[in-house]
Amino acid sequence: MPIVSTFDDVRFRPACATDAQAVATLHAASWRRHYRGAYSDAFLDGDVVQDRLAVWAERLGSPLPEACTFIAERDGVAVGFAHGILGEDPTWGALLDNLHVADGLKRRGVGTRLLTLVAQVVAERTPSSGLYLWVLEQNTDAQAFYAARGGICVGKEFAVPPGGDPRRLNGAPMKLRYAWLFPSKLLASA
């Protein structure tokens, strides 16, 4: 796992169990900001933080050997995180399951650094693997971010409802698959 690094007063490190609340809070805030319309208002306006906390307490409390999670902090406050899962798909490779950055720190390199940290783990542990992610079709800012870093849109499917509960979706939103066949190229551009 990469060592702790710092730039522009932001510290990057592997996440641990004690980060679950901070990660859940960031995750919920990002969903509320970017997924409104695709996810139901009842779900987003409800206790989505508690929903995400259950997920992150499990992921960070009992991490899988094929998973990696990084957190970005500024002045001791979590401002971003990324979570990857190695070998998730036989065709596309490792899954970047989450990448979220607090609104105030977007376009400052935090997301790029988090993406690079996951790509570094992929390159070190599964060097012949690709890297991919899913992004909601309505999240055009994220699509532009990934495309600017060499991600290619290679597929489109219906979004899976959070927690498998279809009431959490509005209609049938679509998600797009972005992929990097050679994630090591992300390291060269970092």
Residue ranges: model-predicted function:
Residues 122-134:
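Conserved GNAT acetyl-CoA-binding A-motif
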Residues 3-10, 14-18, 25-38, 42-106, ...:
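Acetyl-CoA-dependent GNAT
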Residues 95, 114, 141-153:
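Conserved N-terminal glycine/acidic-rich loop preference
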Residues 132-135, 147, 152-177:
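Conserved catalytic-core motifs of GNAT/GCN5-like acyltransferases
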Residues 13, 135-136:
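Active-site-adjacent beta-strand anchor residues
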Residues 91-93, 130, 175:
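A generic structural signal for beta-strand entry/edge sites
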Residues 101, 136-137:
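Short amphipathic helical patch at the helix-1/turn junction of helix-turn-helix
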